[in-house]
Amino acid sequence: NPHYRLWNGRANRFGWRAYLGDADARVAVPGRRDDLGGLAPAWIGVGTHDLLHDEDLAYAERLTAAGVPCQVEVVEGAFHGFDRVAPNVGVSQRFFTSQCNSLRAALALSNRT
């Protein structure tokens, strides 16, 4: 339910403006590109109460359609930044382990090419 998301639309717009400044979003943000082909493998982790949930899953679908390897981890009931708020709980540790395992696999692939 988007009404329970702690990171809201206003915060999201501010965040993108602060991050991008005057940069071209299509260059600075891979998800804003029309063609996602050729991007590096991706790991996308998001909680069901994260404002970016729908945007993240749509990006993952676009990556997959473009032939980019993409692992998606959805955490039921989690909000944006949950793993930073409670880094020592099991769900956060599993989330971090998943990130690390995906990065290791991607780096192993890059060493073979």
PLM ranges: what are they?
Residues 1-113:
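Alpha/beta-hydrolase superfamily serine-hydrolase fold, recognizing
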